[in-house]
Amino acid sequence: MRAQAMARPPARLNTMWPAQATARAMFTDLSPALLHTLYLVAIVAEAMTAALSAGRRDMDWMGVCIIACVTALGGGSLRDVLLGHYPLTWVVHPEYLWMTGGAAILTALIAPVMRRLRSVFLLADALGLVAFTVIGCQVAQMMQLPITVVLISGMITGCAGGVLRDVLCNEVPLLFRKELYASVSLVTGALYLGSMSLGLSANASVPIALAAGLTMRLMALRFNWQMPKFVYRDDWD
């Protein structure tokens, strides 16, 4: 009886998700196949784009593999460390390290033809962004954390890997430039949480969030939508 009482979520959290009895119950009807498939596509795509960034900086093959692994798995790892969610994903699934490292080596071998696949990688990157975001939100939800933390968890999972890549490659992170990237992650997470709070099942909420976020990202790329830019020049000298 005591163990059952300890497993029961605090009463105050029930008001956050009125359509569900517990945080874990939100996902019992959701087949993991869709998100898992998108996750695998995303880490491979992120690893390949990271390998190209490393190649532009004339890194050796070891550097290319490290940059690829950090980019593909760094967002989720940073999220788990900040939230105290252990073990880390790549510790449980070390095959992900081999996948990302292999993708990086393959990219180095076929680099001359990569330009022809630019649109494919943009689509895969957009899919990865929204899939990582939803996965990050779900991890925080399973830990029964506040909504704000859930949103931030989704953004960290979706965006932090790219920030680490750009920092290691000595570039201004894409997250801090004019492109709609972090904002797409935020909207995706908000739509997912909003759908769940309205009583939709995870089977409905996940596709809604993924479709809306993917559409927003692709439209931003197609029509060059940008965030307002702050420009400051010190003219006192």
Task: Give names to the regions the model predicted.
Residues 26-34, 81-91, 136-149, 194-205:
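Helix-coil boundary and interhelical linker segments in multi-pass alpha-helical membrane proteins
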Residues 102-139:
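Ordered, amphipathic secondary-structure segments that act as subunit-interaction surfaces
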Residues 47-57, 80, 105-118, 163-174, ...:
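C-terminal ends of transmembrane helices
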Residues 36-49, 67-70:
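The first (N-terminal) embedded transmembrane alpha-helix
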Residues 62-70, 93-97, 118-129, 153, ...:
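Cytoplasmic-side transmembrane-helix entry/capping segments in multi-pass membrane proteins
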Residues 31-43, 88-102, 146-158:
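Structural signature of hydrophobic alpha-helical transmembrane segments
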Residues 230-237:
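Short, highly charged, low-complexity non-transmembrane loops/tails of multi-pass membrane proteins
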Residues 67-75, 95, 99-103, 107, ...:
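Alpha-helical transmembrane segments in multi-pass membrane proteins
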